[in-house]
Amino acid sequence: MKRPDYRTLQALDAVIRERGFERAAQKLCITQSAVSQRIKQLENMFGQPLLVRTVPPRPTEQGQKLLALLRQVELLEEEWLGDEQTGSTPLLLSLAVNADSLATWLLPALANVLSDSPIRLNLQVEDETRTQERLRRGEVVGAVSIQPQALPSCLVDQLGALDYLFVASKEFAQRYFPNGVTRSALLKAPVVAFDHLDDMHQAFLQQNFDLPPGSVPCHIVNSSEAFVQLARQGTTCCMIPHLQIEKELKSGELIDLTPGLFQRRMLYWHRFAPESRMMRRVTDALIDYGHKVLRQD
C-alpha cells in the first residue's frame, strides 16, 4: 500500500489553494523548483499525474482523493495534538456553503462554536448543487448541499429545507403585472440569477407557467443580499428564501407574486468520516439550528 509523504502532499495542496506554483512556493517558503520536485515525487509514487497543469492548476481524480485524505489527517492531527483545547493554533475549517444559507441561518448556527473555540473559517461560496463537488475534490472538509447521498468515506445528515418565494415590490407588480402574473406578462418582467448556472427561477417559471429557459430578461448578481435589495427597489422580481424576507413580507415592502407556489430546496450536511471532536461540534450546531429554522416536512 502506497503511503504518501505528507510534506509532498502539502505541496500539491498549496499549488491548488494558491492557484499556481509561484505563490505555492512563497506560501511554503521554498523555491518553485522544490514545489515541482515534491509533486513529481508524489506522481512517481502513484504512477500517474496528480495535477492538471492548466491555469489555474487543478487536481486529477487521484489528486482529489489525496487532498481529501490530507484534509482528514490535518483535522485529526490537530485534535491529537490538543490544539483545540489549548488554542495555540487556531484550527482552519474550510466549508463549502451556498450563498442563501450564508445569508440566513448558517452564521447564527455557528455563533457559539466560533466564540468558544479556536477556529478560523474559510467559507467557500458555491451553488448548493455544486458544493458537494468541492468536498469530493478535497478542497473543503464539509459542505451544505442539496445532494442526499453521501460520498465514499463521508457522512451526511438532513438539515431542513429553504422555501423560495417569487417576490417583488408592490410598484414592480403594478408595473409589470397589472392584470396578475401571467405567462405573457412574465416575458417582459426582469428576473435575477446568482450566476449563469443558477436555474432556480427558470425551473419555477417553466414548471408553473410553461416558460422555456432563457425566455425572460435576467440580471446576473453574485449576492443573496443584493437579490433582496433589487426586489425592494423595484428593479426585478426574484426567487428569495422566505426565511430571508420575513420582515419585508410582513411589512408589505415585498409581496408574494404567486401565493401557494414556491420552490423547496432540501439541504444536507456532508463531511468526512471519521469526525474530529471539533467537526462533531460543528455538525451538532448546524443540525440543531437547522432543525429549528428550516422546514422539516
UniProtKB/Swiss-Prot annotation:
InterPro entries listed in its UniProt record: ArgP (IPR017685), ArgP_gammaproteobact (IPR023490), LTTR (IPR050176), LysR_subst-bd (IPR005119), Tscrpt_reg_HTH_LysR (IPR000847), WH-like_DNA-bd_sf (IPR036388), WH_DNA-bd_sf (IPR036390)
Q: Name one GO molecular function term.
A: DNA-binding transcription factor activity
Q: Which residues form the signal peptide?
A: none
Which Gene3D superfamilies does the record associate with it? Answer: 3.40.190.290, Winged helix-like DNA-binding domain superfamily/Winged helix DNA-binding domain (1.10.10.10)
Stored PROSITE patterns: HTH_LYSR (PS50931)
| Highest taxon of source | Bacteria
User: Which residues are connected by disulfide bridges in this protein?
Assistant: none
Q: Which residues form the HTH lysR-type domain?
A: 4-60
Kindly indicate which segments of the sequence are annotated as binding DNA: 21-40
Q: Which UniProt keywords apply?
A: DNA-binding, Transcription, Transcription regulation
Question: What's its job?
Answer: Controls the transcription of genes involved in arginine and lysine metabolism.
Q: Cross-referenced NCBIfam families, in alphabetical order? A: argP, PRK03635.1, PRK13348.1
Q: Which family does it belong to?
A: Belongs to the LysR transcriptional regulatory family.
Summary of subunit composition and partner proteins: Homodimer.
The name this protein goes by in its record: HTH-type transcriptional regulator ArgP
Q: Which organism is it from?
A: Klebsiella pneumoniae (strain 342)
